[in-house]
């Protein structure tokens, strides 16, 4: 596993700012955003670099054409926010809520989700590379035609997650929960699972287990 972490996010070097004061197309560098509630906000064509977001509540927002680079999100709530044409490069979500977020057609590169609630997340047609989901819940998440490379699930909850035209070849699912996962035989081919998980996938070959 070789996922690059956010670079140079030393809190003593960051200046405190408020999200509510951000202007369209503004570039924000080396800033700390903390203890702010800004639900239903719209952000457009901004670039965040070397920033920290701590205890930010930004639910039901529209975040469009934004680039987050070398940025850390800690204890933030972005539930039901739509990220439209956004890029996340060397970012980390730690103990956050991104449940119901729409990341359709976004680009995620070297991003870690740690102890994060990502239930109902939509990563359809996104490009995700070098991604870690650790101790993270992705229940009923949606991956349709998602371009994936070097994805790691470490104790992830993938119950009832849906994968469509998204290959999991060579991806290790063995220590994650996959009960009720919706996937085709073609997409699951080559994935790494344990013996017990194999039972959850027998429906793909049309057999039933006699009790």
Set out the residue ranges of the language-model regions.
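Tandem repeat scaffolds
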Residues: 2-211
